[in-house]
Design a protein with these regions (language model features):
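Short helix-onset patch at the extreme N-terminus, typifying the N->h transition
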Residues: 7-8, 32
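Hydrophobic small-molecule pocket/channel-lining residues, especially in calycin-type beta-barrels
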Residues: 22-161
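Positively charged n-region of N-terminal signal peptides that target proteins for export
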Residues: 1-6
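Bacterial N-terminal signal peptides
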Residues: 8-19
């Protein structure tokens, strides 16, 4: 019984330590607040009034969750999980850019991530996230189409909390 308890404790500590190491090696992990005054878009209404971006280490990748208030006052809340392997996974919620229903992310280098969204199998957008050297700012530049098929471009700036 004592051996089983020691074994279970070692396994639990190993899992916690590996999760902490992954979080430390991924500067994207954390909670980020949108800075609307430093953000811009090609058309009115694409930048949120306020927003929180939470990236949580999960396995070899991360879970991304977004919550905020759109320019028109409506609620935005969506999430997706990625293994940073470029494979698409389901996105759920409301307000996903371009109305994407699947999303994929690849890690280009330690501080750069490229994501692509598809709706019904058709590409609707791509974005690049770059984390600053000090790890305090994430700048996301995106290009795509809105739900009416019009081209869009955005740059959003997020501060780490």
């Amino acid at each position: 019984m004592k051996r089983l308890l020691v074994f279970a404790t070692v396994v639990a500590l190993t899992l916690v330590a590996s999760g902490l190491l992954l979080a430390q090696s991924n500067p994207n992990v954390g909670t980020w607040k949108l800075n609307p005054s430093k953000s811009k878009s090609s058309s009115a209404g694409l930048i949120l009034r306020s927003g929180t971006r939470t990236v949580t280490a999960q396995g070899d990748g991360a879970k991304y969750s977004y919550e905020g208030i759109a320019a028109d006052g409506s609620h935005v809340g969506y999430s997706f999980t990625t293994n940073y392997d470029g494979k698409y996974s389901a996105a759920s919620g409301v307000g996903m850019p371009g109305g994407a229903d699947t999303y994929a992310v690849k890690r280009v280098d330690p501080s750069t991530f490229v994501g692509t969204g598809k709706k019904a199998g058709k590409m609707v957008g791509t974005n690049t996230t770059v984390i600053s050297k000090d790890g305090k700012v994430a700048t996301i530049t995106g290009k795509g189409t809105d739900e009416q098929g019009k081209p869009t471009s955005t740059t959003t700036v997020w501060g780490k909390q």
